[in-house]
Amino acid sequence: MAASIAVKNQKFDLEVVAKPGEFITVATVPNGAGGWTGVQMRETPSSFSATRASIAVFNFNPACPSAQVDSAGKADGIFKNATSKAVQRRLVSPVKATVQVSCAGKASGTPLDFGLLEPGERYSVFVLPTQAGGLVLKDGIETGQ
């Protein structure tokens, strides 16, 4: 699949070719030089459960080389060492979930309230670079610096 992406006054083309069973997430992120670039994150799910939810962290922030995602108020390490330009995903029980992302031991953004996770559904946390240091999104919805 080929796509043309326009962000502000910049336009670029991106080709996406998926392998069978592969999921690809495409994001536009700041390139550090005042422009934008397209990034593809690929994952091949190892399992699916209709009784559990799936949650992932996508780390697009090179200034946060090892993000951690915890349950808000706890240091339980839902995800540890989520390296830049990588994705981690895992199955979790369908419970009410509020998570906090941290970079280098410091909270990044505000806690993300997913509400009740639904069985069989996929949820994502995005860690993005900004001039303020980092932006955290859940499923594409901005939640703070």
What are these regions (language model features)?
Residues M1-Q145:
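Intrinsically disordered, low-complexity polar regions and short flexible loop motifs
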